[in-house]
Swiss-Prot record:
Organism field: Escherichia coli (strain K12)
Function comment: Repressor of the glycerol-3-phosphate regulon.
Gene name, Swiss-Prot/TrEMBL: glpR
PROSITE patterns linked: HTH_DEOR_1, HTH_DEOR_2
NCBIfam families cross-referenced by the UniProt entry: PRK10906.1
MF GO annotations: cis-regulatory region sequence-specific DNA binding; ligand-modulated transcription factor activity
Name of the molecule in the record: Glycerol-3-phosphate regulon repressor
Length: 252
């Protein structure tokens, strides 16, 4: 097989799988690891893939849009979603609030509530809510991501697992056509799973741009949540998953 054909084949595999390891490519193309590494380096130089130690992924599915850009997009939609979610949270509730700009919008919408107890791994959420003297804000320990104020890591997982709260407000980077929830950071996925496991009622908050958006880490099925809050009807295939699993859908 010529190098050009192999390069095209690598790109196609990465598109299909989101991420592909060097070992898989060696076996698939029956060439040496050194040949595959050279191929990946050349494709990465052309910005056709993003090179990882041990493999490669699509640039669009490997690196999230910068936080400031995400914060400035779909703002009206996020505010509508946030207001609807806030209406469902009684005063005096306990809740987790996740990393993400839509969960941050929910935090803003909760400022008129009273006596909430909130556990969060999002520094921006804590900064928003700390003005409320009657709120109890519990900030998870762990590694702080300076790019978006998220807190992740083993310490975060251990911390979240100590609690059992009324609500979990969850964001996500992408939702595949089969209802798979997708993220860019494996550590963040583990934290989200911990929030799901330790919440009595999980609310997924997503604007319409997240449907069909790719990311390389599969967190699991949308059937893990109890309700989905979004601003437009999901694709038919996702709607079918929601219906099959009796997941509440709120269009905001």
């Amino acid at each position: 097989m010529k190098q050009t054909q192999r390069h095209n084949g690598i790109i196609e595999l990465v598109k299909q799988q989101g991420y592909v390891s060097t070992e898989e490519l060696v076996e698939h193309f029956s060439v040496s690891p050194q040949t595959i590494r050279r191929d990946l380096n050349e494709l990465a130089e052309q910005n056709l893939i993003l090179r990882h130690h041990g493999g490669a992924a699509l640039p669009s599915s490997s690196v999230n849009t910068p936080w400031h850009d995400r914060k400035a997009t779909q703002t009206e939609e996020k505010e509508r979603i946030a207001r609807k979610v806030a209406e469902q949270i009684p005063n005096g509730s306990t809740l987790f609030i996740d990393i993400g700009t839509t969960p941050e919008a929910v935090a803003h919408a909760l400022l008129n509530h009273s006596n909430l107890r909130i556990v969060t791994n999002n520094l921006n959420v804590a900064n928003t809510l700390m003005v409320k003297e009657d709120f109890r804000i519990i900030l998870a320990g762990g590694e702080l991501r300076s790019r978006d104020g998220g807190i992740i890591g083993e310490a975060t997982l251990d911390f979240i697992s100590q609690f059992r709260l009324d609500f979990g407000i969850l964001g996500i980077s992408g939702i595949d056509s089969d209802g798979s929830l997708l993220e860019f950071d494996y550590h963040e996925v583990r934290t989200k799973r911990a929030i799901i496991e330790n919440s009595r009622h999980v609310m997924l908050v997503v604007d319409h741009s997240k449907f069909g958006r790719n990311a390389m880490v599969n967190m699991g099925s949308i059937s893990m949540v109890d309700a989905v809050y979004t601003d437009a009807p999901p694709p038919v295939s996702v709607m079918q998953v929601l219906t099959d699993h009796h997941i509440q859908l709120e269009l905001c």
